[in-house]
Amino acid sequence: MLDLFADAEPWQEPLAAGAVILRRFAFNAAEQLIRDINDVASQSPFRQMVTPGGYTMSVAMTNCGHLGWTTHRQGYLYSPIDPQTNKPWPAMPQSFHNLCQRAATAAGYPDFQPDACLINRYAPGAKLSLHQDKDEPDLRAPIVSVSLGLPAIFQFGGLKRNDPLKRLLLEHGDVVVWGGESRLFYHGIQPLKAGFHPLTIDCRYNLTFRQAGKKE
């Protein structure tokens, strides 16, 4: 697939109060990020988690950092232990941490201290239903979301599930940061369309950085 914007400089696209898309912000770091994704997955493999209601998610997931997001019969939680390996989640790669902090600073959140990174792998047809990120103890900390590989349609709404949605194309290297007034806005990913990307072949990766523990 020919990238007509391969030489373009990153630019910012306002999304909502406290939210911005940093177009192509992760483009130059992508190859190292993908190598590090593979390294994390070699220690804590991708898996399709089951929701408390018994639904198997279409997105394959793993984590790195001090805490990892996972599902349980009683709900959703952050845990320092991977329930599949019974070992701590892999450490967050330096490339992840550096990119996340640069993106957060560019978006106006210079004090963000990520301690959890959820890695999602989307195959064609996989999606993420509308949801809020509300399992974190300090909702003043933003969310940083990095797109790699195949393009996807990102849905971004409001504080209510039935609020009007913005639908935006996220491409390889784009980073979305939201916090402040939009921290609890509903968001999701529409079913991924089949395609080819030279770095990820037939899939899309998403890195979601959060501050899941107490700030030091």
Swiss-Prot record:
Pfam families the record matches: 2OG-FeII_Oxy_2
Effect of R161A: No effect on enzyme activity. Decreases affinity for damaged DNA
Name of the protein this chain belongs to: Alpha-ketoglutarate-dependent dioxygenase AlkB
Domain Fe2OG dioxygenase: 113-213
Binding site for substrate: W69, Y76, L77, Y78, D135, R161
Cited InterPro entries: Alkb, AlkB-like, AlkB-like_sf, Oxoglu/Fe-dep_dioxygenase_dom
Gene from which the chain derives: alkB
Lineage: Bacteria, Pseudomonadati, Pseudomonadota, Gammaproteobacteria, Enterobacterales
Cofactor(s) essential for the protein: Fe(2+)
Organism expressing this protein natively: Escherichia coli (strain K12)
Intrachain disulfide bonds: none
